[in-house]
């Protein structure tokens, strides 16, 4: 089978390797679609993420879907949860599997991901796709799950004023969910104009170009000189964190979703302290696939429009180049494109 492995910073190579052999409780999935995530780009450009460094050639890719053959020869299409918690530790037992200390995660550390034609993965992580969802949408359920978890952390309610700082795919999904939750005001910021256009199309009521925090004054005015009740930072940049804190009203919640390249998140402490802000950090997602599937199936969230570029696995270099340049919204690689 074809496999794309990361050997070091910027060093991706196509290999031919044997098909995977499933272990106990695993099934072989023929990978249909892999959406490239910002964390994949961290691995690609920095050979690591969040303190983790590549130690041996790694297969990236954790936002994916595919199909399996059932015992009767039929085909079952599945979205695949990349996270495999132990299920036994304190955090798993208390309902926080995303915080499991021995959690396995596709395309991270020692666990190879989905940029290959086939992957053996635990049955518990396979979610059947309804007929109304295609495999591209199936791959997008993972980032939607992260956005759902972020919005859960923010406790967005009817009439809430929301700020979304960073309008990549996660930020744009947060915009859609905030609208769905009944937010009265959704302010979105980003450096890229095509992302701001998408934010407006997905339900943002006001959009502003991100310019070193200067936009916080406009946000303050737009919010009626009150600031936003919930601020979501989804850019992975300190400038966005600073703007989120500056734009939040007293007593607000700030949810940090982005992953900073330099492993540091900073903001003005006095501003956050005097406002009595609650700062929450979003760690991936937890148990969100069933909700994500229902939201897309019922047409309440649009993930299909986020996918702007699709490539076969042989064109992996071009796919990563487009994603790294942020030329579109979401890039998808299709290892079994012809099937």
Give residue spans per PLM region.
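Mid-domain Rossmann-like dinucleotide-binding core that forms the NAD(H)/NADP(H) cofactor-binding site
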Residues: 77, 124, 133-213, 217
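Glycine-rich beta-strand-centered segment in the early N-terminal region that forms part
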Residues: 20-34, 48-93, 125, 130-132
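C-terminal hydrophobic helical "lid"/dimerization subdomain
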Residues: 1-3, 242-246, 286, 290-339
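Cysteine-cluster motifs in flexible loop/terminal segments that predominantly coordinate metals
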Residues: 37-38, 82-127
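Glycine-rich cofactor phosphate-binding loops and adjacent beta1-alpha1 units
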Residues: 154, 197, 202-278, 317
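The conserved SAM/SAH-binding core of class I Rossmann-like methyltransferase domains
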Residues: 189, 257, 282
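Residues in the short beta-alpha loop(s) of Rossmann-like NAD(P)-binding domains
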Residues: 191-192, 260, 285
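N-terminal glycine-rich cofactor-binding segment
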Residues: 5-21, 38-69, 79, 97-112
């Amino acid at each position: 089978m074809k496999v794309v492995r990361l050997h070091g910073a910027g060093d991706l190579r196509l290999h031919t390797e044997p098909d995977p052999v499933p272990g106990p409780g695993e099934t072989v999935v023929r990978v249909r679609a892999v959406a490239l995530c910002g964390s994949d780009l961290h691995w690609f450009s920095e050979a690591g993420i969040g303190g983790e460094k590549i130690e041996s050639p790694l297969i990236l890719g954790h936002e994916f879907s595919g199909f399996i053959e059932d015992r009767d020869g039929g085909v079952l299409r599945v979205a695949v949860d990349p996270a495999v918690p132990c299920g036994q530790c304190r955090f798993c037992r208390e309902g926080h599997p995303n915080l499991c200390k021995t959690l396995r995660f596709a395309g991270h550390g020692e666990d190879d991901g989905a940029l290959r034609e086939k992957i053996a993965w635990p049955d518990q992580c396979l979610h059947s796709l309804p007929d109304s969802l295609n495999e591209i949408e199936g791959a997008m359920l993972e980032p939607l799950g992260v956005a759902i978890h972020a919005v859960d952390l923010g406790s967005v309610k009817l009439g809430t004023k929301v700020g979304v700082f960073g309008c990549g795919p996660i930020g744009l999904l947060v915009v859609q969910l905030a609208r769905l939750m009944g937010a009265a005001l959704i302010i979105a910021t980003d450096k890229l104009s095509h992302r701001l256009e998408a934010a407006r199309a997905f339900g943002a009521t006001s959009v502003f170009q991100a310019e070193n925090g200067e936009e916080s004054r406009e946000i303050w005015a737009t919010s009626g000189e009150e600031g936003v009740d919930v601020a979501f930072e989804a850019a992975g940049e300190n400038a966005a964190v600073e703007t989120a804190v500056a734009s939040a009203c007293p007593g607000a919640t700030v949810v940090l979703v982005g992953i900073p390249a330099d492993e540091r998140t900073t903001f003005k402490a006095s501003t956050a302290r005097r406002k009595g802000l609650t700062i929450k950090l979003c760690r991936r997602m937890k148990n969100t696939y069933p909700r994500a599937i229902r939201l897309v199936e019922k047409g309440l969230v649009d993930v299909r429009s986020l996918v702007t570029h699709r490539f076969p696995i042989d064109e992996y270099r071009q796919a990563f180049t487009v994603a790294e340049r942020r030329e579109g919204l979401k890039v998808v690689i299709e290892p079994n494109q012809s099937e």
